[in-house]
């Protein structure tokens, strides 16, 4: 289930001290996702109580993907259930009146990826927002066309088969283009889970292999943007610069 929260009233502090324990609090937040037209259920991995993948929600990326001056919303989808067809990633176009239109079917963003994070940024300096998807498995990268549609450019990324958790952008080498730092999660092996027939008798506090700290971490990536003369590419320089941090999650 997706939530879009509207701030109704920010907390007000008029004087220091302790308030009455039973004093009524004003309604400060309200979920407006349904009335705004944002509907998505993130599905990832088998629906087992002990599988860690269904517990990991997706990220979100805000940005004006169609150049109309309104901030749109991208929600990455998971890989779905094993018995289902792949589900599409979702792009919601802001209509400027507090509502959104689902344009996923024409956005060219595909689906079926086990996505955990997303970032909107301008990779090639053309003024159009591009999208990076952090996934379990190969990450995905899409170049924006500036009209709410994208083209797949994942082949520009160094090949990996890890579990990405999040991604951020900054010009670390001060050459005028944005580089990427991709954090990795863990070496997850679902074969270590108890049989499905035993899942109903397990409790969350039981010392089972689903706990993240029982799995080894994966090294992070620093993807240097090698944009030159209009040609885009990325090189992983995390080990070279000592920022791969292989033991954390």
Q: What annotation goes with each model-predicted range?
A:
Residues 1-249:
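Acidic, glycine/proline-rich Ca2+-coordinating loop motifs
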């Amino acid at each position: 289930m997706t939530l879009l929260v509207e701030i109704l009233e920010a907390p007000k502090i008029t004087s220091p001290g302790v308030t009455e324990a039973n004093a009524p609090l004003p309604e400060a937040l309200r979920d407006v996702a349904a009335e705004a037209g944002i509907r998505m259920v993130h599905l990832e991995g088998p629906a087992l109580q002990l599988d860690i993948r269904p517990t990991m929600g997706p990220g979100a990326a805000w940005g004006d993907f169609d150049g109309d001056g309104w901030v749109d919303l991208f929600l990455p989808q998971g890989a779905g259930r094993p018995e289902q067809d792949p589900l599409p990633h979702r792009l919601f176009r802001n209509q400027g009146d507090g509502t959104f239109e689902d344009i996923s079917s024409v956005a060219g963003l595909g689906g079926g990826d086990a996505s955990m994070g997303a970032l909107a940024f301008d990779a090639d300096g053309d003024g159009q927002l591009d999208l990076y998807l952090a996934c379990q498995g190969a990450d995905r990268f899409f170049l924006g066309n500036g009209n709410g549609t994208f083209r797949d450019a994942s082949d520009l990324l160094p090949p990996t088969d890890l579990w990405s958790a999040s991604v951020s952008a900054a010009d670390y080498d001060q050459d005028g283009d944005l580089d990427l730092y991709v954090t990795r999660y863990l070496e997850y092996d679902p074969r270590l889970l108890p049989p499905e027939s035993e899942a109903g008798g397990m409790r969350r506090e039981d010392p089972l292999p689903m706990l993240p700290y029982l799995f080894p971490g994966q090294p992070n990536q620093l993807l240097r943007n090698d944009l030159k003369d209009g040609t885009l590419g990325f090189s992983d320089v995390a080990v070279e610069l000592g920022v791969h941090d292989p033991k954390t999650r």
